Amino acid sequence: HLFPLFQPAEAGFYYLYDGKEYHRMYIKAGDEIHFQGIDGDWKQVDITGEENRLLEQWKEMKRSLKMDARTEAYGAYFPRFDSLRLEVDRWLQETVVRDSLFQKQLKETIEFDLLYDFISYIAKNQQSYESEEQRSAYYRQLIGRFPVEDGRILQQPYGIQLLREYFNYKRTFVIRQGEYSFDDWLA
């Protein structure tokens, strides 16, 4: 089945949830966005607009982070993640969009997507505190400055889940290593 989506009152990011994942799209007046159900999965078809083509490129880049836990070691994720971060940074620098607000939102959205993927991976797979993620450049940067007070996290469809997984990780693997005040715990 192919169906058109509504026309929004204002341009911005919109999400369609199919029960498994969120499909992100950027819709502005006059855009026609169509989704088609294929074997139980929804796929955006007839991608229109520069913004949606860039979102689709990002979605394809992000696929490289998918791991097969049965055949790949836990630590194999982190070099792959750090490599994708470098690739994304280059891609964002080279990508020029006419809509500067969208360009800013794209960068923020990608940062939060990477953060969510990283924290989710650790939360699901880490077995001990002394673990491979600590060798990741992103991990070292993240632990010192997690954006817990950044309201933009809650603008993402996974915002609450991201905060929950981060605090569970800190409580399980970081806080128990020493005495911390509540403020230290939040930092």
Model-found features: residue ranges?
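Short, mixed-charge aromatic SLiMs
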Residues: E132-R152
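Structural motif
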Residues: E94-D113, E149-Q161
